[in-house]
Amino acid sequence: MNQIWLKVCAASDMQPGTIRRVNRVGAAPLAVYRVGDQFYATEDTCTHGIASLSEGTLDGDVIECPFHGGAFNVCTGMPASSPCTVPLGVFEVEVKEGEVYVAGEKK
């Protein structure tokens, strides 16, 4: 089965330390993070409480949820602090010809 890729933005549109929400038709939104020169993507909804992680605070490779302050590693989706215990789904990201693309399905 071929992977569907979603075009997010030009890589230059996201500075290091920024987050962008990606709305998908018929699916839950994603959060795309720029950590240094690398891009990562996870589910945008916190697994602990219904909050948008793209509205949280990115500190290095850790996103803090704006709802209860729990955190996740954006590279792996693994919880980084309580009260979060359930990992986030992560999505492959590629940069091609200066454009950021996110896979339509989880890794």
From Swiss-Prot:
Q: Which InterPro entries match?
A: Rieske_2Fe-2S, Rieske_2Fe-2S_sf
At which positions is [2Fe-2S] cluster bound?
A: 46, 48, 65, 68
UniProt keyword list: 2Fe-2S, Dioxygenase, Iron, Iron-sulfur, Metal-binding, NAD, Oxidoreductase, Plasmid
> Thermal dependence of activity in this record?
Optimum temperature is 30 degrees Celsius.
Tell me about pH and activity: Optimum pH is between 7 and 7.5.
* GO biological process terms, semicolon-separated: carbazole catabolic process
Residues in Rieske domain copies:
6-102
Reading the lineage from the top rank, the first entry is Bacteria
Q: Which cofactor does it need?
A: [2Fe-2S] cluster
Which Pfam families has this protein been placed in? Rieske (PF00355)
SUPFAM superfamilies per record: ISP domain
For this chain, one GO molecular function annotation is:
dioxygenase activity
The answer to keyword Ligase applying to this record is: no
Which free-text remark accompanies the cofactor?
Binds 1 [2Fe-2S] cluster per subunit.
Query: What quaternary arrangement does the UniProt entry report?
Result: Monomer. Carbazole 1,9a-dioxygenase complex consists of a terminal oxygenase component CarAa, a ferredoxin reductase component CarAd and a ferredoxin component CarAc.
Q: Which PANTHER family match?
A: 3-PHENYLPROPIONATE_CINNAMIC ACID DIOXYGENASE FERREDOXIN SUBUNIT (PTHR21496:SF23), FERREDOXIN-RELATED (PTHR21496)
Chain's role: Part of the multicomponent carbazole 1,9a-dioxygenase (CARDO), that converts carbazole (CAR) into 2-aminobiphenyl-2,3-diol. Acts as a mediator in the electron transfer from CarAd to CarAa.
Protein name in the entry: Ferredoxin CarAc
Lineage of origin: Bacteria, Pseudomonadati, Pseudomonadota, Gammaproteobacteria, Pseudomonadales
What gene does this protein come from? carAc
